[in-house]
């Protein structure tokens, strides 16, 4: 997602990668008007319409949707990844840059190390180290994927960087879509 608050625009991108090579198979973007105010914890309502438009524009459905945000690891236990998964029926996971409000112990320094992301005693996700000695990402289930598989998919999508390739490529596409948007919106 990328926002242009001056023009009241939001851009979303969907990127489908080959699971074995991480080569781009398909990509699509959508640009729309911001139709929901910024409310912490309710970003899904602000982002979902444009995300759905980007997913609908893909020539092939993704086998897994990796959201730059949360699923179960959300104060309401229903973040963007959960919301999107329920609406589309697609398997979804959330991979966030920050832990939101949840407690966690730092995972060990090697790539692949994890630590539980806790809401009280409930494990709502995992802090996952995707690079040796680099700040972890925060993985949570969204829809139709277990936590261990969500972590395994995240590691497969992070061979060289902290963030999943899907997120990195989608971020670049969103920024480009906003630059090219001019007055055209979906």
Put a short name on every predicted segment.
Residues 70-71, 97-100:
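Short, ordered loop/turn segments at secondary-structure junctions
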């Amino acid at each position: 997602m990328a926002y242009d608050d001056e023009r009241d625009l939001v851009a979303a991108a969907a990127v489908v990668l080959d699971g074995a090579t991480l080569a781009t198979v398909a990509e699509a973007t959508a640009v729309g008007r911001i139709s929901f105010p910024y409310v912490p914890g309710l970003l899904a309502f602000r982002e979902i319409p444009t995300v759905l438009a980007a997913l609908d524009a893909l020539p092939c459905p993704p086998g897994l949707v990796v959201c730059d945000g949360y699923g179960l690891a959300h104060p309401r236990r229903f973040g963007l990844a959960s919301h999107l998964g329920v609406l589309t029926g697609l398997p979804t996971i959330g991979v966030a840059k920050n832990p939101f409000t949840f407690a966690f112990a730092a995972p060990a320094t090697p790539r692949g190390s994890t630590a539980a992301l806790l809401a009280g005693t409930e494990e709502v996700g995992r802090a996952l180290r995707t690079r040796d000695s680099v700040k972890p990402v925060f993985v949570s289930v969204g829809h139709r994927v277990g936590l261990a598989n969500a972590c395994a998919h995240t590691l497969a999508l992070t061979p060289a960087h902290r963030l999943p390739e899907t997120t990195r490529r989608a971020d670049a596409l969103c920024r480009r879509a906003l630059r090219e948007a001019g007055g055209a919106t979906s």
